[in-house]
């Protein structure tokens, strides 16, 4: 979950948690809520570990979001202290490892040729997928915390102060820049942009979703996910920090203290919307929409009419990750490093495992072989199967 921008020392881990909890508890009524304790459950499913490893020092005490990149048979993972790994999805065998000289600030993006990351010194760096060697680097105006995205010819990075920049994937030449507006107070975060062949879609702390031409970065349309309301800057937060979800010719997007909406990707016209508040992208599966609300409730909506099917509140304020659909379950992580499995039919908690005592910020990922990839804040990385207990 993002934190308030420029209000937390990069090494202030415990201060960061306190401010994060305070933010999570702030609403139009300025209510502060403590995270509920880990719920006691009667588990009917288990997280069975297939393999595990350590990726450097993970986030190394910084409030980062170093999501691994999964492509085909390999997982590419990085730590803040510069450890890079390419790992076989099936066995966890290391294909190659590399020590990067700079401190890493973003998760990995990639295309058919390169991997992309950003550094603490605000550089965008391209690395070879074959061995992790540096291909090119270029300077960015300010820090980037979200993974750079590429369509094979264009690499796009979005800074925390609202700039979206396009670069040549071949040599890092800057091709264009779009300057978005940023309110006085915002999350120290930015959603990774969506990069297609002709269009780039980016979301902003101003509560806007904006489509840009991939060729020149010129705006095509914009959609208001949230409109600032209230008297205080906290009340007026409307950040969109989750990457929009593409569904055929539309994108689904959700904002903090805003709404959940489906928008035509060609025109920006709203197809439908409903009130919602979340910091992460929604997930869909089995005709339902799943959302981790800002207050820690997990909500299932019927896709056909967006009516609420169930709500799970036993993980309230536990700073959950984005839910991941896995077979008949939803999987989320939390700030104390627990993994939780929910039954998709009724939202009941059916499985639980303690994974990383430094917490889990990156959502689990479903691998092509059906297993589940989990990355913890300390750098623990593991693959699990979620299955009924014997």
UniProtKB/Swiss-Prot annotation:
GO terms for cellular component: cell outer membrane. InterPro entries: BamB (IPR017687), PQQ_b-propeller_rpt (IPR018391), PQQ_rpt_dom (IPR002372), Quinoprotein_ADH-like_sf (IPR011047), WD40/YVTN_repeat-like_dom_sf (IPR015943). It is found in: Cell outer membrane. It holds the Pfam family PQQ_2. Keywords: Cell outer membrane, Lipoprotein, Membrane, Palmitate, Signal. One of its GO terms (biological process) is Gram-negative-bacterium-type cell outer membrane assembly. Part of the outer membrane protein assembly complex, which is involved in assembly and insertion of beta-barrel proteins into the outer membrane. Part of the Bam complex. This is Outer membrane protein assembly factor BamB. It comes from Marinobacter adhaerens (strain DSM 23420 / HP15). The gene is bamB.
């Amino acid at each position: 979950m993002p934190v308030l921008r420029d209000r937390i020392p990069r090494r202030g881990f415990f201060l960061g948690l306190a401010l994060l909890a305070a933010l999570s508890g702030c609403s139009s009524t300025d209510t502060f809520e403590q995270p509920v304790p880990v719920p006691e459950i009667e588990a009917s499913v288990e997280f069975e570990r297939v393999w595990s490893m350590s990726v450097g020092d993970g986030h190394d005490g910084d409030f980062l979001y170093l999501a691994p990149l999964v492509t085909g048979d390999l997982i590419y993972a990085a730590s803040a202290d510069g450890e890079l790994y390419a790992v076989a999805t099936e066995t966890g065998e290391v294909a190659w490892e590399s020590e990067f000289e700079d401190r890493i600030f973003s998760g990995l993006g990639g295309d058919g040729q390169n991997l992309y990351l950003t550094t603490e010194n605000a550089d965008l760096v391209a690395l070879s997928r074959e061995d992790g060697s540096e291909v090119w680097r270029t300077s960015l105006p300010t820090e980037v915390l979200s993974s750079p995205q590429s369509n094979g010819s264009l690499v796009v990075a979005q800074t925390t102060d609202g700039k979206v920049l396009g670069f040549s994937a071949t040599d890092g030449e800057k091709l264009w820049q779009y300057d978005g507006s940023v309110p006085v107070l915002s999350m120290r975060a930015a959603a990774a942009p969506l990069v297609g062949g002709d269009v780039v879609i980016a979301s902003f702390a101003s509560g806007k979703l904006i489509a840009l031409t991939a060729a020149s970065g010129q705006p095509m349309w914009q959609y208001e996910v949230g409109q600032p309301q209230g008297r205080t800057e906290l009340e007026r937060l409307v950040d969109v920090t989750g990457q929009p979800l593409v569904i055929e010719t539309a994108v689904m997007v959700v904002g903090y203290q805003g709404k959940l909406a489906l928008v035509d990707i060609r025109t920006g016209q709203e197809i439908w919307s409903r009130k919602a508040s979340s910091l992460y992208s929604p997930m869909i599966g089995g005709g339902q929409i799943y959302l981790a609300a800002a207050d820690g409730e997990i909500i299932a909506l019927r896709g056909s009419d967006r009516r609420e099917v169930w709500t799970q509140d036993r993980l309230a304020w536990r700073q959950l990750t984005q839910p991941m659909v896995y077979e008949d379950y939803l999987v989320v992580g939390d700030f104390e490093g627990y993994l939780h499995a929910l039954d998709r039919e009724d939202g009941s908690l059916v499985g639980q495992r303690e994974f990383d005592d430094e917490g889990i910020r990156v959502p689990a990922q479903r691998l092509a072989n059906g297993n589940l990839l989990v990355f913890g804040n300390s750098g623990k990385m593991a693959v699990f199967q979620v299955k009924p207990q014997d």
